[in-house]
Amino acid sequence: MFSLRSLVDYLRVQRELIDIYTPVDPYLEIAEIHRRVVENEGPALLFHHVKGSPFPVLTNLFGTQKRVDLLFPDLSSGIFDQIAILLSSPPSFSSLWQHRSLLKRGLSSLGLRKQRFRPSPFLHQDAPNLLQLPMLTSWPEDGGPFLTLPLVYTQSPENGIPNLGMYRMQRFDEQTLGLHFQIQKGGGAHFFEAEQKQQNLPVTIFLSGNPFLILSAIAPLPENVPELLFCSFLQNKKLSFVKKAPLSNHPLLCDAEFILTGEALAGKRRPEGPFGDHFGYYSLTHDFPIFNCQHLYHKKDAIYPATIVGKPFQEDFFLGNKLQEILSPLFPLIMPGVQDLKSYGEAGFHAVAAAVVKERYWKEALRSALRILGEGQLSLTKFLWITDQSVDLNNFPSLLECVLKRMRFDQDLIIISDTANDTLDYTGPALNKGSRGIFLGVGTPIRSLPRHYQGPSLPGVSRIGVFCXGCLVLETSIQQINIPLLLKESHLEQWPLIVLVEDLSKTLSDTKEFLWRTFTRSSPATDLHIPVSHVTNHKISYRPPMILNALMKPSYPKEVEADEETKKHVSSRWDKYFS
């Protein structure tokens, strides 16, 4: 059985955790302390005295690359490379023998096992009081306190297949939480099935510090691959449970610090939000399902795990990158033709991705692009950049130059309007609605890219800069810019991509800022402006340049920012926290 206390002790020894004994408030104060520590690549934080709760709070468990590597040492040893080799090799005794340790790991560790305790490791509340939990309010305009690391377990009413996902939950009262289910993800699909049958959906929520459980809950696994099974494989041992929950028959995992059991109520919705999310903006108030908590279990010395999300880099960035690192050897097996793939956490992962693919025949790259956009959570990608060249996808400027040199505007630019969109992304015409853009750059270069702008001043543009060769960045505003007029500037045709932004200095300060400001503030169908060359056989052919309007639109939610009062309060107490 995993022990969070042992993990805390280990991180102390490694000087990767600091104990804070100064009393702190879960309303804004903890979040602001956490953000400052994350910004300085600091340690995990254990707050021992939290106002209004008997439970300590643990945050920033995953806040640096170093700490993530410490928490998952075995996953950096190439275990998924071995899986890829085994699965791609013709079956033979020698191959099986060579990978016998991997097979043994799979046979011995997969699944769950019941573990007997006397007494039980959990205390049980028949009349649960969620007000005792030190739920955090992270941003000043958040709608209330939230569970930010809930591991939400459901089973399909149709076939019983389980799902473990992470969906934020807003506390409404002693027994009720808002459940931010998204229809594109497993828990939301299960709730849809339950409502079709006019049934409540049994839901079990684990609050656990087990890094493998957390990693598994956010992993972009193929549909119907159980996350608990994946977790047991990652940690190389079965998950233990004490018993099955009343009514739902869900396993009560020993690795949890807190377990909430209850139901998502069919046909019932309640306004949830706002919430400062991992895109760095507030997701707005919308009606979402209601979770009614019927039982609350917790360890006697329970530690409440939490995270704070916001503008990158936060903990989710490092976890997401670790997942991509360990799963990357499997991409060519799951999606033949895809040699490398990266979603950019700098823009919240779903906004922009890139892939290196094979182009062995005409438009094979397009086939691979469509396959990527049909795969699980990757289907939420807005901007997808594709090349067949050997390029380091971690270097986005190099990737962008590689594509722009090769992209033929009459056939390599595909815009798909009216698609589903990430629920947290407000760049589309309505909630859950958006578009996709595929940008292909394969074969030999067809153009040289300019590296410096040497043209005249542009109407409505206050400053001009260059992100990388071929990508011009213009500082302007919604009120000043006239995009149709800009497209008539013939000297701009040599620049394949032109991005409109409010703040040139911030956008060009580093790659993270460019990715975040460009792709979280735009949608392919509504914000790409490209001259049309002609239309043939229902295919639109374009010509350069393409102007991407990444300006903040009036309909967009606000960027998250801490309030001045909280900043001053935390600054005045900073030395006390760490004395």
Swiss-Prot record:
InterPro entries: HBDC, UbiD, UbiD-like_C, UbiD-like_N, UbiD_Rift_dom. One of its GO terms (molecular function) is carboxy-lyase activity. One of its GO terms (cellular component) is cytoplasm. Pfam families: UbiD, UbiD_C, UbiD_N. PANTHER family: 3-OCTAPRENYL-4-HYDROXYBENZOATE CARBOXY-LYASE-RELATED, 3-POLYPRENYL-4-HYDROXYBENZOATE DECARBOXYLASE. Belongs to the UbiD family. NCBIfam families: mena_SCO4490, UbiD family decarboxylase. This is Uncharacterized protein TC_0359. It comes from Chlamydia muridarum (strain MoPn / Nigg).
